[in-house]
């Protein structure tokens, strides 16, 4: 089984770490738009494998969705975070575009994947992914 986590920030990296540590799949792909960010996080997680006694493969990628091909599950965590004083609605249009782009890439490379959205505002981002995936 292959799981992709899109977004290597705190939520995404923690999600990838837990999935790998609990051996919920054979391979975790961590993707982020920031250059070398996902690769670094994946390497950090992978290097804990011997100590934590798991053998899940984990790899990072900078925006190369071809590495996510044939994922069984994709977790979308990538959006811009809220800054102090912002409401959850302030970033809807920006975050919707991010989720739309990510979902299009997911469908292109893993059309049968189960998509889990963990991006705020959650209800709107989930609906955006649903519409984009044309489920």
Predicted regions and their residues:
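Glycine-rich Rossmann-fold phosphate-binding loop(s) that bind the pyrophosphate
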Residues: 8-9
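N-terminal Rossmann-fold NAD(P) dinucleotide-binding loop
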Residues: 12-13
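Short beta-strand element of Class I
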Residues: 25-29
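Conserved NAD(P)H cofactor-binding loop of Rossmann-fold oxidoreductase domains
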Residues: 78-80
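Rossmann-like NAD(P)(H) cofactor-binding subdomain of soluble oxidoreductases
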Residues: 87-134
């Amino acid at each position: 089984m292959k799981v992709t986590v899109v977004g290597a920030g705190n939520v995404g990296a923690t999600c990838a770490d837990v999935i790998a540590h609990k051996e919920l799949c054979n391979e975790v792909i961590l993707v982020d738009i920031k250059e070398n960010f996902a690769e670094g996080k994946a390497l950090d997680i992978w290097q804990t494998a011997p100590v934590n006694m798991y053998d899940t493969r984990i790899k990072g990628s900078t925006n190369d969705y071809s590495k996510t091909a044939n994922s069984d599950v994709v977790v979308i965590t990538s959006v811009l975070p809220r800054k102090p004083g912002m409401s959850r609605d302030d970033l809807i249009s920006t975050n919707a575009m991010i989720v739309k782009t990510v979902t299009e890439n997911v469908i292109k490379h893993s059309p049968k994947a189960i998509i889990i959205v963990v991006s705020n505002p959650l209800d709107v981002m989930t609906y955006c992914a649903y519409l984009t995936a044309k489920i």
